[in-house]
């Protein structure tokens, strides 16, 4: 069984790393002027998801929750087991902070789309400051959560009591855990990972409905190209909003395991195996919907070894940025600052 999940992590993590690196490159060098400010958020998404995929590949976590108790056991089966337990612990802490930052970033993206319907586009510096402000809670989580992990010598005797039916002594991965989830640092981390997801998700869909209502009410005042361009980016964001449901599933699996509702090694492996799908699939939305990105991807598929050819070329046109099915949607710069 462990072989299957190792292949799963390697496959999805490597795919996610490649797609997010590609998206970062395209957002920096191929973003049209019309979405230059928004490209800041795209780069934020891509960088966060790349780090998350790389860390998932590095640690490959099995989460064994102690049913009915505030305790967790972690088993790391990734390459980090060859670099020391500390690297596994810090790796998990930063992976979890990427998950939370991705959720906040999604909220920023939808909020910005709603904002620019009534206001001029924000500068890239302003968007960067907003992103950093939302990033601080996740950074605090990353810098503190790893300090809670106890060494193998301390967790193994306890884990054998909690799970006598597991042969944990022969476990080849790094064995560690958190023996007190009531600690303030642990409460902060678990709450920050699990609680914001569903309120943020509800807010995202409320914003989506407001944007759709506004576009419908302003349809006679907007040009067809402008409205179509907004609609296409909204579709990209909506698709991207569906993808984090994988994180929601992972959270529900964790609660099921922690509460004792479900108990299975497959469940323990599946929590992080499901979560990796979010950062691995997320970049596809922009690679498909943003026309210059999509055109570049097609050229890469035809000539896979020419990704970095002519990097000095930058997308300068404000037209044809978003795709509608197989046809480009043309718009001019006011699409970013619709009043």
From Swiss-Prot:
PANTHER family: SERPENTINE RECEPTOR, CLASS D (DELTA)-RELATED, SERPENTINE RECEPTOR, CLASS D DELTA. It comes from Caenorhabditis elegans. It comes from the Eukaryota. The chain crosses the membrane at residues 2-22, 39-59, 90-110, 130-150, 187-207, 242-262, 270-290. Disulfide bonds: none annotated. This is Serpentine receptor class delta-19. It is found in: Membrane. One of its GO terms (cellular component) is membrane. It holds the Pfam family 7TM_GPCR_Srd. The lineage of its organism: Eukaryota, Metazoa, Ecdysozoa, Nematoda, Chromadorea. Belongs to the nematode receptor-like protein srd family. It is a multi-pass membrane protein. Keywords: Membrane, Transmembrane, Transmembrane helix.
């Amino acid at each position: 069984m462990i072989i299957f999940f190792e292949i799963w992590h390697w496959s999805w993590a490597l795919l996610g790393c490649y797609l997010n690196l590609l998206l970062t490159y395209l957002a920096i060098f191929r973003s049209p002027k019309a979405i230059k400010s928004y490209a800041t958020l795209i780069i934020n998404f891509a960088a966060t998801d790349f780090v998350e995929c790389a860390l998932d590949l590095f640690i490959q976590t099995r989460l064994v929750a102690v049913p009915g108790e505030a305790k967790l056991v972690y088993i790391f089966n990734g390459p980090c087991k060859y670099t020391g337990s500390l690297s596994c612990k810090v790796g998990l802490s930063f992976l979890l902070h990427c998950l939370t930052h991705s959720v906040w970033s999604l909220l920023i993206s939808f909020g910005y789309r709603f904002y620019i319907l009534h206001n001029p586009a924000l500068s890239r510096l302003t968007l960067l400051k907003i992103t950093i402000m939302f990033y601080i809670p996740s950074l605090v989580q990353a810098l503190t959560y790893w300090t809670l992990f106890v060494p193998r010598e301390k967790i193994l005797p306890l884990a054998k009591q909690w799970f006598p039916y597991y042969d944990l002594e022969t476990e080849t991965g790094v064995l560690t855990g958190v023996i007190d989830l009531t600690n303030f640092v642990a409460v902060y981390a678990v709450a920050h990972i699990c609680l914001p997801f569903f309120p943020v998700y509800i807010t995202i869909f409320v914003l989506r409905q407001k944007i759709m209502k506004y576009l419908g009410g302003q349809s006679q005042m907007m040009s067809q190209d402008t409205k179509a361009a907004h609609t296409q980016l909204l579709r990209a964001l909506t698709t991207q909003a569906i993808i984090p449901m994988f994180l929601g599933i992972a959270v529900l699996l964790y609660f099921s395991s922690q509460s004792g509702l479900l108990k299975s090694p497959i469940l323990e492996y599946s929590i992080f195996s499901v979560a990796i799908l979010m950062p691995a699939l997320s970049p596809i939305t922009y690679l498909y919907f943003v026309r210059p990105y999509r055109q570049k991807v097609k050229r890469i598929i035809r000539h896979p070894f020419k990704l970095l050819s002519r990097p000095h070329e930058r997308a300068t046109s404000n037209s044809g940025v978003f795709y509608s099915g197989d046809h480009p949607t043309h718009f001019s710069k006011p699409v970013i600052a619709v009043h």
